[in-house]
């Protein structure tokens, strides 16, 4: 088949590459992602998006591949950094209180909820091992070979939970020699050190690679003690707001810092001339970072301004136990900050993660055994950790066996374990509205088998296989929102221990085929059948850990011991036609489907709210082109898509029973207090992606991208929702663009080279909720990053000066609102110097 690569590698070399592929220009977005051998053009980028090795320009789908070299050139160190230059990709850390988790969306489709009852909407893979949770997924990008971002549903190629697309990260494999040591020093306390070393264990047979990294940065939001800074406040004088700061600067800590280290080891067994290659990897990460940066934008005093009639006004809500009003004196910056406020700082918060004595039992809990206390009686202080850390480790093994020149077998086995601790004080004040201390323990095992074949004189490429996945997640939390406004006056009622377990099993069989009808026309198709089952066990305990927690709406209706079950079988399809107009120009048309698994109610308050919801499903129609023009000085790739989104998972305003009727108030039907997810409605998503790389002269390179996502709900299945037909999805912007330019100036044979690079990226604004409340709208922003790198003549030494957010732009990544509004500010300008020694 024209322009395809071999199924396997023998002794690290590609065994079959067509001449047109070798001529296929330069790597998308600038640098080579793979340069495994001198026999391969160093500018060819090889990807495995279609489960076989291909030049990225031959893959008939919307894909961006980025090399590890380009990640370094752009000063991108974590997975969330790549969002700036990726068309139609939103990848950010979640707001404070959601741990070390990320929100990932491709083409407006994805997931941000970290609950184990909800599945990711974009699949993330590390060396082909599926990672089944958004927690702990802000991966470090040290020693990365390449990243592939596949846009659109990948149900047949990648499988479960690739509704919006897939992100695939590939680490560098051992080659037998070489390595580096690198150190970075910058403002905001940045100290980074990383190193990697390659060894030959057995000549021409066994190789090893070890990599380590540590990253340290100060937080960019400072937490202050309100009582310390405001000693004349009448609530401070009365003692209702105690001062807890121990230092004279009134600081309690930071938010948004980074403290982590990670190690990875890999072993490659590839005897020269042998049909067998085995790659074994193990990694460990310890992240002790504090919670994500967040600030109070508006309190209950101001958040209701301009809201529609009927909106619940909590502006006068107070804290009965403390007798403190929750008002704008706790706002430190912006239009709702009071003129006489002590602080005028966009990077400041009064969150103290402390409740001096408001730990309560549930309404109606009887005195004496088993709890031993009276409802409403304070039990002692509650201190939540200012944490968003994670501890994770994993092992994997990939076995490639070449059965013949035309037949190969691959086995991919992986096990991962992750523990994440998070705490929140999301009201950003010393009063007690919303606090929690949550732990997540996630374990998963996966096994995939693939059989690749090249048949009919290389005209037919065939991949068949199976996939198995087993995961268990324990969610243990202390939820503390005692005066959230849902209870009778002066009655604390919403404080309990959550100890849930979610178990998921999934297995699938798949087949993908590509047939070269002619030297230029190729037809491809695929099918995958997936069966999955999730069981979710609920446990709710009183704050002292004794006795079932009795829900606020029905004291005789506990949740403990109830199990919710979701089970579904889903079939995905793919059909593609691609045509090579010339050796350097290809057009294609594709139809594909994908799904995001269903689940059960993530946060029910009574057992009647336990109800399964089905999978989200997507049908996508895409046409595109890939070209290398002007003697390969210009690369231009583009795609246009239309997607039909079925079964959007969302929360109704009033919970429904299994008969689709609103639950009674005494049975979980409290308006505004629903912990269900339902398949609320359908939507359509349209847009495009366009990417280019231009090399007008030796050493000069320009790259750019632009994209558009138009998301619109087309039908609503249930009336008890805030969503209306025609609404956009919150958190999703429309038009996005980026551009970068660099020039490598050769200073002389014995001097080296100097490479300046500038990147500019524009992120669109979006509505923060379905109402497009102006209080939670996120404005668009444009960021500029710069880097200047000197390399020695033999490139064994390099030194770089970099500036991220060069013009110190203040912006919000996201905002969140209930009866107050908080936001996550982006990091201010950061400057650093990096020195690297290669050997």
Sequence positions of predicted segments:
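N-terminal Sec signal peptide and the immediately downstream disordered periplasmic leader
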Residues: 1-74, 79-84, 278, 395, ...
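Acidic, small-polar-rich N-terminal luminal/periplasmic segments of exported/outer-membrane proteins
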Residues: 41-176, 623
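Outer-membrane beta-barrel translocator/receptor signature
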Residues: 121, 133, 142-151, 156-237, ...
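Outer-membrane beta-barrel domain signature, strongest for Gram-negative TonB-dependent receptors
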Residues: 247-252, 258-462, 635
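Structural signature of Gram-negative outer-membrane beta-barrels, strongest in the C-terminal barrel
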Residues: 268-270, 451-452, 461, 467-469, ...
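Outer membrane beta-barrel strand-and-loop segments of large Gram-negative receptors
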Residues: 440-448, 496, 502, 506, ...
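Gram-negative outer-membrane beta-barrel transporters
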Residues: 523, 639-644, 671-770, 836-838
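C-terminal beta-signal and adjacent terminal beta-strands/loops
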Residues: 644, 651, 761-769, 789-839
């Amino acid at each position: 088949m024209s322009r395809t690569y071999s199924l396997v590698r023998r002794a690290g070399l590609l065994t079959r590459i067509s001449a047109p592929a070798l001529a296929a220009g330069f790597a998308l977005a600038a640098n080579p992602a793979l340069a495994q051998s001198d026999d391969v053009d160093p500018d060819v980028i090889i990807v495995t998006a279609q489960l076989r090795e291909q030049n990225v320009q031959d893959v008939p789908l919307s894909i961006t591949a980025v090399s590890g070299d380009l990640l370094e050139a752009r000063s991108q160190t974590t997975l969330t950094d790549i969002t700036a230059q990726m068309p139609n990709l939103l990848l950010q850390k979640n707001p404070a209180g959601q741990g070390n988790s990320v929100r990932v969306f491709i083409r407006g489709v994805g997931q941000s909820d970290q609950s184990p009852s909800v599945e990711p909407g974009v699949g993330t893979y590390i060396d082909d091992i599926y990672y089944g949770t958004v927690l702990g997924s802000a991966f470090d990008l040290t020693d990365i070979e390449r990243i592939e971002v596949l846009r659109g549903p990948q149900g047949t190629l990648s499988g479960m939970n690739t509704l919006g697309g897939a992100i695939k990260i590939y680490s560098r494999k051992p080659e037998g020699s070489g390595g580096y040591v690198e150190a970075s020093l910058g403002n905001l306390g940045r100290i980074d050190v990383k190193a990697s070393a390659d060894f030959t264990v057995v000549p021409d047979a066994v190789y090893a690679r070890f990599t380590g990294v540590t990253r340290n940065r100060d937080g960019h939001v400072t937490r202050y003690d309100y009582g310390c800074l405001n000693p004349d406040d009448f609530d401070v004088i009365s003692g209702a707001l105690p001062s807890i700061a121990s230092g004279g600067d009134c600081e309690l800590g930071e938010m948004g810092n980074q403290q982590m280290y990670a190690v990875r080891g890999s072993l490659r067994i590839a005897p020269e001339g042998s049909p067998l290659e085995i790659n074994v990897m193990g990694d460990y990460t310890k992240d002790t970072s504090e919670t994500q940066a967040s600030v109070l934008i508006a309190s209950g005093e101001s958040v209701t301004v301009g809201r529609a009639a009927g909106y619940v006004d909590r502006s006068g809500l107070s804290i009965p136990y403390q007798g403190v009003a929750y008002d704008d004196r706790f706002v430190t910056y912006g239009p709702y900050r009071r003129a006489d406020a002590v602080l005028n700082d966009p990077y400041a918060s009064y969150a103290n993660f402390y409740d001096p004595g408001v730990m309560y039992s549930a309404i109606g809990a009887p005195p004496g055994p088993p709890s031993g206390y009276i409802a409403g009686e304070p039990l002692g202080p509650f201190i939540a950790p200012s944490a968003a850390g994670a501890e994770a480790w994993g092992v994997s093994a990939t076995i490639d066996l070449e059965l013949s020149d035309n037949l190969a077998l691959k086995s991919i086995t992986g096990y991962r374990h992750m523990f994440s601790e998070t705490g929140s004080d999301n009201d950003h004040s010393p009063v007690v509205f919303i606090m929690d201390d949550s732990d997540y323990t996630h374990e998963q095992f996966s096994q995939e088998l693939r059989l690749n074949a090249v048949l009919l004189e290389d005209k037919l490429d065939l991949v068949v296989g199976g996939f198995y996945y087993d995961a268990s997640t324990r969610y243990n939390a202390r939820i503390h929102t005692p005066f959230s406004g849902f209870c009778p006056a002066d009655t604390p009622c919403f404080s309990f221990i959550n100890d849930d377990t979610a178990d998921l099993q999934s297995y699938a069989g798949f087949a993908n085929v590509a047939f070269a009808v002619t030297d230029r026309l190729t037809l491809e198709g695929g099918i995958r059948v997936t069966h999955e089952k999730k069981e979710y066990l609920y446990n709710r305990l009183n704050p002292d850990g004794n006795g079932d927690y009795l829900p606020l709406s029905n004291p005789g209706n506990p949740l403990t011991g109830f199990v919710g079950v979701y089970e579904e079988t889903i079939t995905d399809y793919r059909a593609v036609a691609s045509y090579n107009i010339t050796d350097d120009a290809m057009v294609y048309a594709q139809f594909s489907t994908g799904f995001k698994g269903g689940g059960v109610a993530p946060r029910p308050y009574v057992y009647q709210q336990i109800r399964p919801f089905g999978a989200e499903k997507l049908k996508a129609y895409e046409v595109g082109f890939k070209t290398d023009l002007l003697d390969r000085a210009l690369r231009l790739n583009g795609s246009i898509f239309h997607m039909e989104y079925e079964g959007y998972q969302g929360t109704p305003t009033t919970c429904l029973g299994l008969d689709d009727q609103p639950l009674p108030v005494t049975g979980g039907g409290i308006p505004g207090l629903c912990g269900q997810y339902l398949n609320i409605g359908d939507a359509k998503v349209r847009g495009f992606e366009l990417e280019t790389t231009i090399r007008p002269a030796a050493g000069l390179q320009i790259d750019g991208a632009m994209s558009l996502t138009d998301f619109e709900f087309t039908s609503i299945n249930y009336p008890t929702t805030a969503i209306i037909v025609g609404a956009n999805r919150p958190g999703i912007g429309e038009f996005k663009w980026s551009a970068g330019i660099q020039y490598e100036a050769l200073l002389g044979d014995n001097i080296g080279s100097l490479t300046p690079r500038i990147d500019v990226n524009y992120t669109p604004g979006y509505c923060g909720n379905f109402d497009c409340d102006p209080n939670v709208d996120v404005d668009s922003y444009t960021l500029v990053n710069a880097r200047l790198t000197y390399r020695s003549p033999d490139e064994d030494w390099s030194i770089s000066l970099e500036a991220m957010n060069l013009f110190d732009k203040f912006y919000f990544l996201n905002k969140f609102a209930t009866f107050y509004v908080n936001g996550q500010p982006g990091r201010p300008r950061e400057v650093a110097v990096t020195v690297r020694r290669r050997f």
